[in-house]
Each structure stands twice: as structure tokens, then as C-alpha cells.
From Swiss-Prot:
GO molecular function: ATP binding; glutaminyl-tRNA synthase (glutamine-hydrolyzing) activity
SUPFAM superfamilies according to UniProt: Amidase signature (AS) enzymes
Protein name (record): Glutamyl-tRNA(Gln) amidotransferase subunit A
Pfam family, one: Amidase
Keyword Secreted on entry: no
HAMAP family in the cross-refs: GatA
Length: 497
């Protein structure tokens, strides 16, 4: 199977080039940022009726930003960043002053933020035009974008299948040539999982290294913004733009940004000699789709052929990660989403003079939240209630500690861990929507990393022999060693060419 949207469907070659290539053309003045940005806007107009990657397209704002870059470059100024002039798609969970921020929920339909998220600000300061805001599961809760209040995103590899979630819109935009760069968020796999399903690269940075200021919270101890693109180098270049300490975010870590771009360039020689790669036993077993395991084993053998030493690693508490995650996350959701009450911003429903303030709040939340968001609020409220807090929430936090300890012990033996990113390739839209447990299981391989706050990457590892659909290889690195992902990821990418 091929992705016709990149292989056959792009009439303008600018929409198939990498971000690094586009930056080189723009900075040498062979093309203008306006030309590149307009090509991608035209691409969105041509194919987004099929894909539904975008919830909002800001044509005027994007072209104005591109013109500003061109003006500065024509005046002889140095580029504001290595990606200046290259347009980007932004997940609709980061606040923007010039476009609606909805988190794909009716609760925030049409909401205009009075401030930019720190990630948004850094993108603007880097001279990167924002094409628009991408589709997602409502408040980042879901694995398929089917929880979006505005309809699901379709996978460019097969329009009947999911592009993943929660950030399926960002990854689908990359895979369809609608954007060369995109930003997502990862709470339990929402960057890495869509990347795997769409044959793109997605990175969850170490928790605290990318600011969460202006990121609409799902679960504050798990959420992390991150970069996604079509190559490892492009992803590294974007990572460098958005990372760094932010005084507006109390969870932001004040330490130097890992040398991710340097690592990606060094890894491009394809040499993995001296690298110890750990294969997580818990993620390499029966029950996964045969084509996924076949591609994963081939990837491990490729790394061995590139000089890596392969070691099997046992992380016994990973088996308990799913249960712990789906207790901790709803508890944080029930607290974070209490702010959406219809009183200060967003939707207000039923305020017709016949209801009390409490009744208006209850009615607003009933009308504004979708079924999955309501499910998680109820579950979290229950788990935090008197008599259940110790039995559920505290137990889940203890498991979280054990998972972090499993990772720590593993990194005493190896430099990096690997697993399939997802247990199967992209499933058909509607296939799991009535079975929450089946949907939750799809994040089995990605969520342990969020519980431990570590760094992870998904990158293409071929097509499954049984479905012909993309398979992702997940790399997992210790905290603040994000550069390891890029060094190993770039080497693996080079070995596949």
C-alpha cells in the first residue's frame, strides 16, 4: 500500500520536500516563504475535505507571517531560526490570540484566547508561519480523533482508517503534504501513536523541557508538548525551537536544552557501534498483530547490523501501567476540567432565567462535554472520593513509582529501549468506538513513558506485511537525554534508506 497523498497527489513539489530542504531554499532566496506557505495552503484546500486534519486554517495570518520573514531576509537579516519561513500546523490545544482554540470541544467552540501559549510564542519568534489549528480528540482524550466534537481525521494511507489520537490531525497533515512541520501533545502517546500510524516521526520530550503554559490541560503530570515531522532531522530542528525553561510554567525544568540537532546530524552516518539497545520483553510477545511484530523484529535486526548490541530487558511493572494510567489520568482530568463551568469563558447553555447558577453550570457541562470526557470526569471523581482515594489513586501512584524504577534499572544495562509503538496498525474508524477498553489498550506501549516522565520517539519502521500499513518503532531514552533519541533515530532512519 502507498500513501497517494504524498506519492501521487502533490502537484506542487514544495509540499513533498523536508522542512530542512525548504529552509535551505528560503534562506538562499531560491524561493520565498510566501511561495512555500501558499503551496501548503493550496494543498490544504485541495485535500482537507478528504483528510479533515484542520479545524481552523489561518490563511491571512500565515501569509502575513511569511511576508515578514521574506522582508527581513531580503533586507539582509539573518534568519530568526533554522526553520524561519517554513510553515507549521499547530494542534488545537495551544492557545493563540489570532485563531480560535477549541481543544476540539463544543465547550470552547469559537473561544479566542487573550494570550499565546509559550510554544506558540516561540514558534512566532522563530519566524515559522502557522498554517492553522489541527483536529484532535476532545481535550486530548482518545486514541483515534473520533472523540472530536467536529468529526474524525482520516488516515492518508487509507481514508477508512484512523490517523491515531489524540493528535491525529497534526500527523495526518504531515502525511498528506499539508504541512512540513507540526506540533502535538503527548499525555499517553498522543504524538507517538499517530506518528506510527501515518509513517511520520513524533517525539515526546522529557517532561518539563517544553513549556505547558497556554496548553489546555488534560492531565498536568502527564501532558507534554512536542514536535512531529516527516524526518528525524526536521523533528530535531523543531524540538530545538520549542524547548527550554519557562518561568510561566511551574513544572518547567531550568536546564540546558539537549543538543538534539547536533545528535540528529551525527546519527545520520548510520553508525550504531557501541550503542546498547534494550528490547522490552513485555512489549514483544503474542497478542500483537503479526505484521507489527515482524516489522519490529526486522528493525531490531537492522540495528544489530548497524553495530548495536541488542539486550533483552525485563520491566515487570509495565504490565500494570495501563490500569495505573487510567486511574491517574481521570483523577487529574476531573480536577482540571472543573474550570469549564460556563461562568467565565466558553460555552454557557441553559441561562434563560429559569435555572439557578448551579443548574446552569450542570446543564452547560452536560451540553459542552462529549461522552468520553464525561466518562473520564466521572471515573476520576469516583476514584478521588472518600473511601476510594487510598484504594485506587494512591495505589496507582505506587505503581507509577515502580514503573519509573523499572526504567531506571533498565538504563543501568542499556543506552536506549525499543518496542513497537502500537500493538496493531491503524484500525478502521468506528471499529473500537463502542469499546473503551479496546481503545485504551491501543496505548499500551506508549503510556509507561509518560508515567515516568521520560523521552520517547516513534519513527517509521516499514509497512506491515499483513495490512500494508505503516508500523512505528518506539525509542525510549532516560530523562533529559532526548539527544539519544535523535542520534539513534537518525542512524536507524539512515539505515533504512
Amino acid at each position: 500500500m502507498t500513501n497517494k497523498y504524498l506519492v501521487e497527489g502533490s502537484e506542487n513539489e514544495l509540499t513533498t520536500k523536508t522542512a530542512a530542504e525548504l529552509a535551505g531554499l528560503i534562506h538562499s532566496r531560491e524561493v520565498t516563504s510566501r511561495e512555500v506557505t501558499q503551496a501548503h495552503l493550496d494543498r490544504i484546500a485541495a485535500v482537507d475535505g478528504d483528510i479533515h486534519a484542520f479545524l481552523h486554517v489561518g490563511q491571512e495570518e500565515a501569509l502575513n507571517a511569511a511576508d515578514d520573514v521574506d522582508k527581513r531576509l531580503d533586507a539582509g537579516e539573518a534568519p530568526a531560526s533554522a526553520l524561519a519561513g517554513v510553515p507549521l500546523a499547530l494542534k488545537d490545544v495551544f492557545t493563540t490570540t489570532d485563531a480560535p482554540t477549541t481543544a476540539a470541544s463544543k465547550m470552547l467552540e469559537g473561544y479566542m484566547s487573550p494570550y499565546d501559549a509559550t510554544v506558540t510564542r516561540k514558534i512566532r519568534e522563530a519566524g515559522i508561519p502557522i498554517l492553522g489549528k489541527t483536529n484532535m480528540d476532545e481535550f486530548a482524550m482518545g486514541s483515534s480523533t473520533e472523540n472530536s466534537a467536529y468529526g474524525p481525521t482520516h488516515n492518508p494511507w487509507d481514508l477508512e482508517r484512523t490517523a491515531g489520537g489524540s493528535g491525529g490531525g497534526s500527523s495526518a497533515a504531515l502525511a498528506a503534504g499539508q504541512a512540513p512541520l507540526a506540533i502535538g501533545t503527548d499525555t499517553g502517546g498522543s504524538i507517538r501513536q499517530p506518528a506510527a500510524l501515518t509513517n511520520t516521526v513524533g517525539v515526546k520530550p522529557t517532561y518539563g523541557t517544553v513549556s505547558r503554559y497556554g496548553l489546555i490541560a488534560c492531565a498536568s503530570s502527564l501532558d507534554q508538548g512536542g514536535p512531529t515531522a516527516r524526518t528525524v532531522l526536521d523533528t530535531a530542528l523543531l524540538h530545538e525551537v520549542i524547548a527550554g525553561h519557562d518561568a510561566f510554567d511551574a513544572t518547567s525544568v531550568n536546564r540546558p536544552v539537549a543538543p538534539v540537532v547536533q545528535a540528529a546530524r551525527e546519527g545520520a552516518n548510520g553508525d550504531l557501534k557501541g550503542v546498547k539497545v534494550g528490547v522490552v520483553k513485555q512489549f514483544d510477545r503474542d497478542g500483537y498483530q503479526p505484521g507489527v511484530l515482524e516489522a519490529f523484529h526486522a528493525s531490531v535486526e537492522q540495528m544489530r547490523s548497524q553495530g548495536a548490541e541488542i539486550v533483552e530487558v525485563d520491566c515487570p511493572h509495565f504490565d500494570d501501567a495501563l490500569g495505573a494510567y487510567y486511574l491517574i489520568l481521570p483523577c487529574e482530568v476531573s480536577s482540571n476540567l472543573a474550570r469549564f463551568d460556563g461562568m467565565r469563558y466558553g460555552l454557557r447553555a441553559g441561562d434563560d432565567g429559569t435555572r439557578s447558577a448551579d443548574e446552569v453550570m450542570a446543564y452547560t457541562r452536560a451540553q459542552g462535554f462529549g461522552p468520553e470526557v464525561k466518562r473520564r470526569i466521572i471515573l476520576g471523581t469516583y476514584a478521588l472520593s472518600v473511601g476510594y482515594y487510598d484504594a485506587y489513586y494512591l495505589q496507582a501512584q505506587r505503581v507509577r513509582t515502580l514503573i519509573a524504577q523499572d526504567f531506571a534499572k533498565a538504563y543501568e544495562q542499556v543506552d536506549i529501549l525499543v518496542s513497537p509503538t502500537t500493538p496493531t496498525t491503524a484500525f478502521k474508524l468506528g471499529e473500537k468506538v463502542t469499546d473503551p477498553l479496546e481503545m485504551y489498550n491501543f496505548d499500551l506501549c506508549t503510556l509507561p513513558l509518560n508515567l515516568a516522565g521520560l523521552a520517547g520517539m516513534s519513527l517509521p519502521s516499514g509497512l506491515a506485511s499483513d495490512t500494508g500499513l505503516p508500523v512505528g518503532l518506539q525509542l525510549m531514552a532516560p530523562a533529559f537525554q532526548d539527544d539519544r533519541l535523535y542520534r539513534v533515530g537518525a542512524a536507524f532512519e539512515a539505515g533504512r534508506k
